[in-house]
A protein has these predicted regions:
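Short loop/turn segments that connect beta-strands within beta-propeller blades
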Residues: 78-81, 118-121, 159-162, 201-204, ...
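WD40/WD-repeat beta-propeller blade N-cap
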Residues: 46-53, 87-94, 127-134, 168-175, ...
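Blade-level signature of beta-propeller repeat domains, shared across WD40, Kelch, NHL, RCC1
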Residues: 297-322
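WD40-repeat beta-propellers
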Residues: 73-76, 113-117, 154-157, 196-199, ...
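Residue-level detector of Asp-centered blade-edge/turn motifs that repeat once per structural unit
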Residues: 58-61, 98-101, 139-142, 180-184, ...
């Protein structure tokens, strides 16, 4: 039948409809949907400790350094999982930083940042300026490092002349976490003032703020520039610039630590005693590790192929993909 152009009215002719075709053939099989499979982390090794481990740090691609609540700094060889040596600090270890080979900076519950030569088991010097506990240490380049404290300040230090060259002010409560961003000239801090802040550490300028509902306790960054935050509101947020793109809310307590595994997956450790592995492409949790019996405090993606966790259950656990 031709198209009615509307210029003339077609005759009113009724055409018989063809009979419906009835078939008893069953519908064809549905195509199976592809099933995404994920490798799982399994426990490969465990250290039983005499005190709570508070920090994990990789050394020389094959060693692990730990800090503990009784002030002990221990160095393990992960080729044989043997303790090589240890150093005793006077205060609870909150963070560790290797600035150059054998030279370790410690942040503790005192206001001092101490420098140790671990090969000589000797304290070399102290960096003085903070007024309260030093929670974070980050190496910025071959000359400078940054520290963050419960005194609400971030300090930029010249490692070689032991001087503070800049103080970054803007948070109004304790600062819990600090990372250097991919472009190297910027850092990001997380605070009990319910924000994460981006800074140009070379000028001291605050570049922007990422809001949370509660304390921000953990940070990491992906290779595409996205920042991941976690905190006491039990959520993990993925930020695209200054806009929150995705929120993950499966933890039942504070998210204490975050670890970038390979830019597609991250791990989170929580006060709910669990570690969760997240697929950031699918935006979902693909594994929950429940083998810790107390709060998960720190995570480390070690170049030996281990995801390492420590907990207030006084254990360090080594996980590997199978």
């Amino acid at each position: 039948m031709g198209t009615n152009c509307g210029c003339c009215k077609p005759p009113n002719i009724r055409h018989p409809q063809p009979p419906a075709i009835v078939t008893n053939n069953p519908p064809g099989p549905e195509k199976p949907q592809p099933i995404q499979t994920y490798k799982k982390y399994n426990l490969k090794h465990k250290f039983e400790c005499s005190d709570n481990i508070t920090f994990l740090l990789e050394l020389n691609n094959k060693k692990l350094m730990t800090g503990s609540s009784n002030g002990t700094i221990a160095i393990y060889n992960l080729d044989n999982f043997e303790l090589e040596y240890s150093i005793k600090e006077e205060n609870k270890i909150l963070c560790l930083l290797e600035f150059e080979p054998n030279m370790i900076l410690t942040g503790t519950q005192s206001e001092l940042i101490n420098l140790y030569n671990i090969s000589q088991n000797k304290k070399i010097d102290s960096f003085k300026g903070h007024l309260l506990s030093v929670n974070c240490l980050v190496k910025l380049n071959a000359k400078y490092f940054a520290s963050a404290s419960n005194d609400k300040d971030i300090r930029i230090w010249n490692y070689y002349n032991r001087s503070c060259e800049r103080i970054l002010k803007g948070h109004n409560n304790n600062i819990f976490c600090l990372i250097q961003l991919n472009n190297k000239s910027q850092i990001c801090s997380g605070s009990a003032d319910k924000t994460a802040k981006l800074w140009d550490w070379e000028t001291g300028k605050c570049l922007g703020t990422l809001p949370h509902q509660s304390w921000v306790k953990s940070l990491c960054q992906l290779s595409d520039g996205s920042i991941i935050t976690g905190g006491d509101d039990k959520t993990i947020k993925k930020w695209h610039g200054y806009k929150c793109g995705e929120t993950f809310n499966e933890h039942k307590d504070s998210v204490k630590c975050l670890c970038n595994i390979d830019n597609k997956y991250i791990a989170s450790g929580s006060f709910d005693n669990t570690i969760k592995i997240w697929d950031l492409t699918e935006n979902k949790c693909v594994q929950t590790i429940t083998e810790h019996n107390d709060k998960v405090i720190c995570l480390l993606n070690h170049s030996k192929g281990y995801l390492i966790s420590c907990s207030n259950d006084k254990t360090i656990k080594f996980w590997k993909l199978d």
